[in-house]
Amino acid sequence: MPKVGLFNKEGQQVGDIQLNEQVFGVEVNKYALHQVVVAQLANKRQGTQSAKTRSEVRGGGIKPWRQKGTGRARQGSIRAPQWIKGGVVFAPKPRDYRMSIPKSMRKVAMTSALTSKVADMVVLEDLNFEAPKTKEAVKMLNAFEAKKTLIITAEVNENVYKSARNIEGVTVMPVNNINVYDLLNCKTLMITKEAVNKIEEVYA
């Protein structure tokens, strides 16, 4: 079973913690990771982009000048795509980008993402601030030399969230909001011991 250090928020190791092999020690499935990340990013898209084709732009029904004899290039409509204020060629229309992923694949992707982050994981014995204080959050991150950090707490923690929300490259979320994209996108995964236990309850 994978074993990692257990730290306090001052950066001092206070012990070790055994991680469940079914969650943090699986074979990384790159295909599942790719599928879930693509679906997650696709599902974030609004799909509301829209433009008009030449048939939808107002006007342009009459031929601007006769076909021959003017010395100018032949034109059929002032709303053709080559004209200013003309329609758009293959104009985008609103569409639904949603993708559905099987539950089993989502689980495989999540355990693969967690396994791939074990080497960059910092497990905290506890994480709480008496009051929202960005200075305290910066001090904690500096103690671990953390860059582009994802902080996962067991529950919604307002003090931790408010302390870290203004720090560039730091994301804070409760354990029930974790997702594959954010796990893969961080350089350092900072997670509380209680949050680890909750993850193992769900995915083991």
From Swiss-Prot:
InterPro entries: Ribosomal_uL4, Ribosomal_uL4-like, Ribosomal_uL4_dom_sf. GO terms for cellular component: ribonucleoprotein complex; ribosome. One of its GO terms (biological process) is translation. It comes from the Bacteria. One of its GO terms (molecular function) is rRNA binding. Keywords: Ribonucleoprotein, Ribosomal protein, RNA-binding, rRNA-binding. Gene3D superfamilies: 3.40.1370.10. Pfam families: Ribosomal_L4. Residues 44-76 are annotated as: Disordered. One of the primary rRNA binding proteins, this protein initially binds near the 5'-end of the 23S rRNA. It is important during the early stages of 50S assembly. It makes multiple contacts with different domains of the 23S rRNA in the assembled 50S subunit and ribosome. Part of the 50S ribosomal subunit. Belongs to the universal ribosomal protein uL4 family. HAMAP family: Ribosomal_uL4_B. This is Large ribosomal subunit protein uL4. It comes from Clostridium perfringens (strain SM101 / Type A). The lineage of its organism: Bacteria, Bacillati, Bacillota, Clostridia, Eubacteriales.
